[in-house]
Amino acid sequence: MAQIDIRQVRKSYGKTPTLHGVDLSFDSGEFVVILGPSGCGKSTLLRMIAGLEEITSGEIAIGGRVVNTLEPRERGCAMVFQNYALYPHMSVAANIGYALKVAGVPKAERQRRIEETAKIVGLSDYLERKPAALSGGQRQRVAMARAIIREPAVFLFDEPLSNLDAKLRVSMRAEIRKLHQRLSATSIFVTHDQVEAMTLADRLVVMNKGNVEQVGHPLDIYHRPASTFVASFIGSPAMNLFTTKVEVETPAVILSGTPVKLFPETALELRGRNVTVGIRPEQCVVSMDGPGVPAIVDFVEELGSGRIVHADIAGETFSAAIGEDLLVKPGQRIHLDLPTAHLHFFDPATGKRIETEGTAETARSKNETLLAV
């Protein structure tokens, strides 16, 4: 296990900057997921930790030792790639033990560690097979076994599940998590898949355009996104966002001519300002003729475990989770009630979160009081 410290790390390709002064610290034994869209710099950062990319400026330290000038083999890291990169002419056992063979580990010791590692990842019965005779999930296990056998201080995962089908991704997520609990090694996992991020991470790093947008526990980030980017990137469907002006007298914001109530403290703090308001689809309350903002149904997604209605409000699409008892179809008029306690506020100019007396836990507690009256 090793702590990783990233200090003001920048990366440029010629005159094109890719990473803009990244500052991060990962605790020893922590499982960190770096999440972001394609091109955000997450894989570049991982490759810089591994030593596969040069650092333009800044420092990376592993276990208290600055590794900027160290070769990849000297950093104590093992990497698992999206592409398994197995030797097709070698058996599973030979693939797993190849690094030990190159390092000159005696044959008996090498065989013992191959068998122990194969047992950890459930490949004991496949050691004599070639990669072509394995499923995608089994090949990924070989790739992980090849990393485990080196007994590294740090595991680096670069989108290792992207080539697997949906069912295999679920089972491999569980295997990776159990593996981490067993080995307790510091692990950094890069992905663009928010489900992988939410289910695997002890701590989540959200990146966008070479910058770190937010760092925290996955649920903290989900419930308190630091920006409109995080709010729209985390969650499926994404958070509903609309920009409007705060009315003090009501107190409310107006959406398509309909007031959406605010707590008085919120209205006073934000009075007269344009704000971007957000609410998660599962926190909208949908009815056919109840209170709320009128909307026209565009389409309904049947997910088996639930249903999502997508509706038009003044030319903007809003999403809301609905139960099986509410039957709606395209073209129908519905009403979306947006509970005060679940509203989020952002600065339209910067996209950054605005904290007020009427948001988050304070708002929820006040809402419970209002409902009790």
Swiss-Prot record:
Gene Ontology terms, MF aspect: ABC-type glycerol-3-phosphate transporter activity; ATP binding; ATP hydrolysis activity
Enzyme class: translocase
Pfam families for the chain: ABC_tran, OB_MalK
The ABC transporter domain, residue ranges: 4-234
Catalytic activity: sn-glycerol 3-phosphate(out) + ATP + H2O = sn-glycerol 3-phosphate(in) + ADP + phosphate + H(+)
Enzyme Commission number(s) from the entry: 7.6.2.10
Compartment(s) where it occurs, according to its Swiss-Prot or TrEMBL record: Cell inner membrane
Membrane topology (UniProt): Peripheral membrane protein
Keywords: ATP-binding, Cell inner membrane, Cell membrane, Membrane, Nucleotide-binding, Sugar transport, Translocase, Transport
Single GO biological process annotation from the record: carbohydrate transport
Binding site for ATP: G36, P37, S38, G39, C40, G41, K42, S43
GO cellular component: ATP-binding cassette (ABC) transporter complex, substrate-binding subunit-containing
Disulfide-linked positions: none
UniProt cross-references to PANTHER family, sorted A to Z: MALTODEXTRIN IMPORT ATP-BINDING PROTEIN MSMX (PTHR43875), OSMOPROTECTIVE COMPOUNDS UPTAKE ATP-BINDING PROTEIN GGTA (PTHR43875:SF1)
Family the UniProt entry places it in: Belongs to the ABC transporter superfamily. sn-glycerol-3-phosphate importer (TC 3.A.1.1.3) family.
Quaternary organization: The complex is composed of two ATP-binding proteins (UgpC), two transmembrane proteins (UgpA and UgpE) and a solute-binding protein (UgpB).
Role this protein plays: Part of the ABC transporter complex UgpBAEC involved in sn-glycerol-3-phosphate (G3P) import. Responsible for energy coupling to the transport system.
Protein name: sn-glycerol-3-phosphate import ATP-binding protein UgpC 2
Organism this protein belongs to: Agrobacterium fabrum (strain C58 / ATCC 33970)
Gene: ugpC2
